[in-house]
Amino acid sequence: MIITIGGLPGTGTTTTSKLLSEKYGLKHVCAGFIFRDMAKEMNMTLQEFSSYAETNTEVDNEIDRRQVEAAQSGDLILEGRLAGWILKKSDIKPDLSIWLKADPMVRCVRISERENENVDLALEKMISREASEKKRYKEIYNIEIDDLSIYDLVIESSKWDANGVFNIIEKAIDNLKA
């Protein structure tokens, strides 16, 4: 089984992916972790690396390559803002493609708690990062990140806690047609 989970920062994609991975015994591959690791390898902050990635397409190409390679082996949760799009462009059909969304201020508070920084700083970084990514996705892939038409399930994650979101997805998985 291949499941993609996408969403903007602070929507709960990592938490949800981990819960699903544990429940279904699927490997968890996260594009964000790959991106963060690459930023650390280059001694850059996420903001600096996002700016760097805008003009260096090899960053996205490497992340994509690793995601497609993982998906080809099957049985995984592929987490990333473009996970669903990358598989679509590679002619790999996931069993379920999910997008999590949440109110920007809810996301900002979640990010500030996760990163242990004040909300104003988290908001500034979030806006900058999302603008950078949106630009990059359009230029490199001709993808509008706001186009949710490829997803089987779109969940407003600010309405439920992590277990509530997990329960919705669990029901969807358990009711997939064979």
Curated annotation (Swiss-Prot):
Keywords: ATP-binding, Cytoplasm, Kinase, Nucleotide-binding, Transferase. It holds the Pfam family Cytidylate_kin2. ATP binds at G7, L8, P9, G10, T11, G12, T13, T14, T15. The lineage of its organism: Archaea, Methanobacteriati, Methanobacteriota, Methanomada group, Methanococci. Its EC number is 2.7.4.25. GO terms for cellular component: cytoplasm. It comes from the Archaea. The gene is cmk. GO terms for molecular function: ATP binding; CMP kinase activity; dCMP kinase activity. This is Cytidylate kinase. It catalyses: CMP + ATP = CDP + ADP; dCMP + ATP = dCDP + ADP.
